[in-house]
Amino acid sequence: MLIALTGTPGTGKTSISNILSENSFEVIDINKVADDEDFIIGNDEKRNSKIVDVDTLNGYIKENYIKKDIVFIEGHLSHLLKSVDKVIVLRCHPDELRKRLSQKGWKKEKIKENMEAEILDIILCETVDKHPKKSVVEIDTTNMNISNLAALIIEIIKNKFEHMKKYNIGNIDWSEEILKDFYNKVE
């Protein structure tokens, strides 16, 4: 089973991937694969990001990992792969996301871009556009420590993504953050 582990940068993908690896799960860093296998087809200078040939990357993942038991495909593009069976979308409150990305030394404009993406559910919307809703869960990592998050993800896998109503898509909504800023400007 191929499981995409995705989310806006700063939601905890890399941290949880390290814990899952320590627990004997195979974790593939999609960004590393894209770099190593020359699936980068350009650069978006405005957004300071690489442009990845997702179709070719998908074919590579399908060809090399589809027959394995459980493989996590980690990265904020992993949900775009049609070859994955399940998707775990990690979410984080925008204020906490700002703190996490600031601690990583990110520039303000890039932090703002990612906060906006999180508020607008960009990754979740892209995920639902490519995968059946029953194959997708979303987890709020805002106040969750990494060990508890790892245990939760393992539980979700054991339950085969079923009976996890709390983690069904649509339970996390940061849209009030847009309104908060709007109302602060009015007052």
Positions of PLM-derived features:
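Hydrophobic anchor at the beta1->P-loop junction of P-loop NTPases
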Residues: 5
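ATP-binding Walker
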Residues: 11
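Walker A/P-loop
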Residues: 14
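NTP-dependent small-molecule kinase module
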Residues: 128-187
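ATP-dependent small-molecule kinase phosphotransfer cores
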Residues: 25-81, 173-174, 178
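A glycine- and Lys/Arg-enriched "phosphate-lid" helix/loop adjacent to the NTP-binding pocket
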Residues: 42, 92-143, 158-161
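P-loop (Walker A) phosphate-binding loop of NTP-binding proteins
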Residues: 8, 20
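Pre-Walker A (Motif I) flank of P-loop NTPase domains
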Residues: 1-2
